[in-house]
Structure formats: structure tokens, C-alpha cells
Amino acid sequence: MAERGKRKFRTGIVVSDKSNKTRQVSVERTYRHSLYDRVLRSKSKFIVHDEKNISHVGDTVKIMESRPLSKMKRWVLVEVVNKTSEI
């Protein structure tokens, strides 16, 4: 049996939980510009599959790359790292 390649993991913050079993997660990364030697920040939004609807807006979550689940969903929720307090 063939082994799967190494999967990518990201940590981000849930920015939308309006859809059932689907979350929008914003992932921020920092990198240094090669020419100007300045630290830059960039954000990416990922559409994530949340099978049990356990995450909510503001939660910090860990996501993993997976096979395509729909037109935009290619990531799956692995765990909720830090929950926000319910007000």
C-alpha cells in the first residue's frame, strides 16, 4: 500500500461559523522580505470542514490539509486549541 505524502497543518482563528459543518479560518504568517529585510505579515482564509460543529467565532483551531470535499473545502478541523469565553 502506498504511503500518503506529508500533510500540511496550520493554526488560525475562526472568523465565520454561519454555515453548517463549515468554518472560515484566518491564518496569519510572518516572513522577512528578501530584498528590503523587513518583516511582513500576510493573512489567508481557508474554508474548513468541521464535522461536529465544535468551533465558533474567535476560537483558535488547528487544521489539516485533506482531499477536496467540495468546490472550496480542502481543509479539515483537527482540534480546537483555545476556546473563547461565552458572553
Swiss-Prot record:
GO terms for cellular component: cytosolic small ribosomal subunit. Keywords: Ribonucleoprotein, Ribosomal protein, RNA-binding, rRNA-binding. One of its GO terms (molecular function) is rRNA binding. GO terms for biological process: translation. It holds the Pfam family Ribosomal_S17. InterPro entries: NA-bd_OB-fold, Ribosomal_uS17, Ribosomal_uS17_bact/chlr, Ribosomal_uS17_CS. Gene3D superfamilies: Nucleic acid-binding proteins. Part of the 30S ribosomal subunit. Belongs to the universal ribosomal protein uS17 family. One of the primary rRNA binding proteins, it binds specifically to the 5'-end of 16S ribosomal RNA. This is Small ribosomal subunit protein uS17. It comes from Endomicrobium trichonymphae. The lineage of its organism: Bacteria, Pseudomonadati, Elusimicrobiota, Endomicrobiia, Endomicrobiales.
